[in-house]
């Protein structure tokens, strides 16, 4: 197997060429164009967001993103991690890089002692469940600054049981 190097880095420590490589890799899956990817990155990614980078021979082949965001629970503002992105280059998908990035993501969430939320296609719910993610009843949480399709699923990780029973109001973009 080719040697895989995993790195975790905050946005404020990313170099421009790495941001460009991230946007190129994301564009292989979400085909909006590099310029659009860069604009989105510059608009929505904050200094303390966590980027998980997977390299083989100095080439970025996998990427995960945890965005530091806030939610309201019983009128109190709290922090959480929005698991925004997991993408692996098609050429390298058989090397279990997605598994390694998912394990790193879970480890990071536990280390930061926060809960995390993601929105995904129903066809990949089983993948996330392997790493301890739980599907959430759509009536309990609400995303205040983003609409998402009913065909998608919301999942949470490291969430206290009390949060599962009451309404949570999430923010993704602020």
Give a label for each model feature:
Residues 1-3, 9-14, 119-174:
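Terminal substrate-recognition subdomain of acyl/acetyltransferases
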């Amino acid at each position: 197997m080719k040697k895989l190097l995993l790195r975790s880095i905050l946005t404020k420590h990313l170099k421009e060429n790495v941001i460009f490589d991230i946007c190129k890799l994301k564009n292989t899956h979400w085909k909006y164009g590099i310029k659009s990817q860069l604009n989105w990155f510059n608009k929505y990614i904050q200094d303390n967001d966590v980027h998980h980078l997977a390299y083989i021979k100095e080439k970025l082949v996998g990427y995960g993103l945890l965005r530091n965001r806030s939610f309201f629970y019983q009128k109190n503002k709290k922090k959480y991690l929005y698991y925004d992105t997991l993408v692996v280059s098609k050429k390298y998908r058989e090397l279990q890089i997605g598994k390694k990035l998912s394990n790193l993501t879970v480890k990071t969430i536990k280390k930061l002692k926060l809960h995390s939320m993601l929105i995904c296609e129903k066809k990949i719910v089983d993948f996330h469940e392997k790493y301890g993610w739980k599907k959430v009843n759509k009536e309990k949480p609400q995303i205040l600054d983003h609409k998402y399709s009913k065909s998608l699923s919301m999942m949470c990780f490291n969430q206290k049981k009390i949060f599962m029973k009451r309404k949570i109001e999430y923010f993704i973009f602020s």
